[in-house]
């Protein structure tokens, strides 16, 4: 049984905030928020231990200059069911021990299921990236989104699209806010280091003469039909464009490829997951970026806004960020050969023609961390009084 008796807040009179993360995307998106909340609140950062590999975890704390988490929950189990159960159980024990005034989570990963324990302990819950919907039940994240949105006391959405989804669910409008995406703030804080990266020299790549690939989503990697279709299409892409395809390959994707015996085209170069500065430097100088990452639309919008647009192709059949399609920031490709090659051709030619789309208005604010601090400070007491009848 885990013992959290030695974990404690500083008790310095400030609001005691517990932030829970578990994966690389959460760490990246919350980077500016974590720094800002540490300035104004008494903060404990807890990591569930889901992405325990250094390339998926530690490198981002280093790149983004974040202090290590105060506590690791070590929730990874022998299978998904055990891991989810451990996340709920361990986060409950931690919250019962340290008694935070509020809990903050972001997104739709399994680490967000920690809000179940917070609800039972009557702790106000604040949820960033609320209201995202892709309407595709094959995505495990879609289930998590609904659960976390419903349980949370205050939902902070990226866009008006997401706010409408929350309203349609019947959630209280008076406790739903559009803060915008936190990515512009994080990227702008790191832009000088991104531009200064020497990753091209280290990898021997010529700017504009390679395709950057990221494919790691469960529905693309773990489903046999989708896996075969996607990587067959990737091989055809390598053959057609005859240039290096740098694959930022997560451990689970690498293991899946090895177990399947699938033979990648020799021009597809598997590389361990790249750090934040290196990856974004590669993105802004690529012939095209082909990715199933949820942050692709936000990154494309940001780099367009600072004069570094790149052809962005999303290898999915749905998106929870329709506001980025509204502004022409990326192309949805699907995972079959014909759709992928057509999408890459289209995105590249549009970029060459100088028609780069427009930055998404909800993705350009660089004070999202300040908004989050003020919302948490404003509503912790309100939730305690109006929801839990405290005081």
Language-model segments: which ranges?
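Nucleotide-activated sugar donor-binding and catalytic core shared by glycosyltransferases
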Residues: 1-243, 253-391
